[in-house]
Amino acid sequence: MSKNIHICNRCENNSLTFKSPHYSPEEYFEGNPKAKVWIIGLNPKLDDDKKKHTDQKKKDLREYFKNNGKTIHSYFKTFKKVSEQLFDMFEKDEAAHTDIVKCATNSFTFTSNKVRKDVIKNCQPYLIEQIKKYQPDLIICNGAAVCETIKSIVKPKKELNGLETSYVGSIDNYKVRVVLSGFIGRIDNYARRRLGKEIEQYLNK
């Protein structure tokens, strides 16, 4: 890592390199990292200008939801269909978002399952560092690959049977509630609201 540029080359064999003058991979958050509710996605997607995620200033990332207002990215607008309460928490610094994979890619999918698994494995230590440092109360997993990864990091108290939609797990001695979901951008509105009601139960405890 140079003095002025944060670089990660762990995935250069898969044509991914993290490079930013503003923040390191473990600093990558949209919103307030000290928020008690986190949404975790798989990886950021590049917008048309190819600079949306990799060149933003650290302050812009921290203030992302306050700065965007009604022009917030469509990815985040989907969460309003899940829960307006959750969506409103973004602007209040009560909810934040990060990804397992910190490098932005041209799409939300990878060229193969092997590449996806390799990239997730390489980037996973950054997420572990984030979770241990900030210790959110609630983690919402956005997508099957995210669910599987989080279950391997935040260990359930007992083996899951595959039907659970949430669990309490731990990493070291820290415990956290984890909500499991398919990719919110692809599930229907009925499933989104069912998910939202479950999330709201935990938010309102």
Language model regions located:
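Short hydrophobic segments within beta-strands
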Residues: 40, 98, 141-142, 181
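Beta-strand-turn-beta hairpins that frame and shape the catalytic cleft
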Residues: 35-37, 87, 92-93, 169-179
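Charged, often glycine-rich, active-site loop that binds/positions anionic groups
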Residues: 96, 100-123
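C-terminal capping/extension of enzyme domains
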Residues: 2-16, 113-128, 147-205
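Active-site and ligand/interface coordination hotspots across diverse enzymes
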Residues: 1-71, 123-126, 130, 167-172, ...
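Short, solvent-exposed loop/turn segments at secondary-structure junctions
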Residues: 43-47, 101-105, 144-148, 183-187
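Proline-aspartate-enriched helix->loop->beta-strand connector
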Residues: 127-143
